[in-house]
Amino acid sequence: MAKPSAKKVKNRRKVRRTVAGALALTIGLSGAGILATAITPDAQVATAQRDDQALISEGKDLYDVACITCHGVNLQGVEDRGPSLVGVGEGAVYFQVHSGRMPILRNEAQAERKAPRYTEAQTLAIAAYVAANGGGPGLVYNEDGTLAMEELRGENYDGQITSADVARGGDLFRLNCASCHNFTGRGGALSSGKYAPNLDAANEQEIYQAMLTGPQNMPKFSDRQLSADEKKDIIAFIKSTKETPSPGGYSLGSLGPVAEGLFMWVFGILVLVAAAMWIGSRS
C-alpha cells in the first residue's frame, strides 16, 4: 500500500488544526457566554440595586440636613449631643423618626412622641442610609415588599387577632412590660423625670422595633429573649386592649374594678358632701 505523500499529510494536519482551533474558539465563546449570564444580574435585580442606591442617596441628603449636627458626618456621634448611629440599623431609625422623637427639640430626660417631621417614605430613606453604614436590626416586610403593620398582630393573624395570641401576648406583656407600661400599655412614671409612654399611638412596626432595639430607657429584647412570634403576640395583646369596646362607657384606663371602685367612692363622697352642705344651708 502506497504511503500518503508528505503534502497530503501536511494538508490533513492543517485541517485538523483548523478544526481544533474552531472547536476551541466555539467552546471558549460558549463558556464566556454562560459565565457572563451567570454573573450578570437580570434587569429586575439591577433595577432593584439602582433603587436601593437612590434610596440611600436620598437618605443621606435628609441626614445631612436634619441629623448631622448631633450624630456627626460619619454617624459616629457628637459628644454631649447625640450617640453614634453605627450599627443601630433601620429599626431604631424608623422608631425614633416615625414616632417624631427625632429630630429632638431639646436635650432632656426623654424625647417625647410628637407629630413626625418626615413622611414614611423619607423615614425609610434615612433608615436605609444608616443601615448602609453599619448594618443593624432591620424592618419587618411582607412577602410583597410592603412594610408589615397589621400582619404583626400575632403569630396566627389572618385578618383578625386570635384569642390564643392575645392570651399568650398578655402573659408575656405582664411578665416583661407591665412593670413600666402598666397592665394595659397606658404608660407610667419612672425615676429622674423619665416615663414609660402610652402605647396607644404606636403602630405595630414601632412596637416591634422598640422591643428589638430598646430605645431610650427601654431594655432590648433580642430574638433569644423574645422570639419574633412572641413579639407579635405581645403586639396582639396591646392592640386588643386598645380596640376592645367598653360597654359601660369610659374605660378609666382599662384598669378594672380598682379604678372603677375608686372613682365611684370619690364621686360618691363628693355627692354626699354636696348634699350635706345643701341641707345645712337650708336649715
Curated annotation (Swiss-Prot):
Subunit comment: The cytochrome bc1 complex is composed of a cytochrome b (QcrB), the Rieske iron-sulfur protein (QcrA) and a diheme cytochrome c (QcrC) subunit. The bc1 complex forms a supercomplex with cytochrome c oxidase (cytochrome aa3).
Keywords: Cell membrane, Electron transport, Heme, Iron, Membrane, Metal-binding, Repeat, Respiratory chain, Translocase, Transmembrane, Transmembrane helix, Transport
GO molecular function: heme binding; iron ion binding; ubiquinol-cytochrome-c reductase activity
InterPro entries: bc1_cytC-su, Cyt_c-like_dom, Cyt_c-like_dom_sf, Cytochrome_c_Oxidase_Subunit
GO cellular component, one term: plasma membrane
Protein name per its UniProtKB record: Cytochrome bc1 complex cytochrome c subunit
Gene3D superfamilies: Cytochrome c-like domain
Spans through the membrane: 19-39, 261-281
Subcellular location: Cell membrane
Membrane disposition: Multi-pass membrane protein
Domain of life the protein comes from: Bacteria
Chemical reaction(s) catalysed: a quinol + 2 Fe(III)-[cytochrome c](out) = a quinone + 2 Fe(II)-[cytochrome c](out) + 2 H(+)(out)
Inactivation phenotype: Cells lacking qcrCAB show strongly impaired growth in glucose minimal medium, which indicates that the bc1-aa3 pathway is the main route of respiration under these conditions.
Binding of heme c 2, residues: 177, 180-181
Residue stretches making up the Cytochrome c domain: 54-134, 164-242
Function (record text): Cytochrome c1 subunit of the cytochrome bc1 complex, an essential component of the respiratory electron transport chain required for ATP synthesis. The bc1 complex catalyzes the oxidation of menaquinol and the reduction of cytochrome c in the respiratory chain. The bc1 complex operates through a Q-cycle mechanism that couples electron transfer to generation of the proton gradient that drives ATP synthesis.
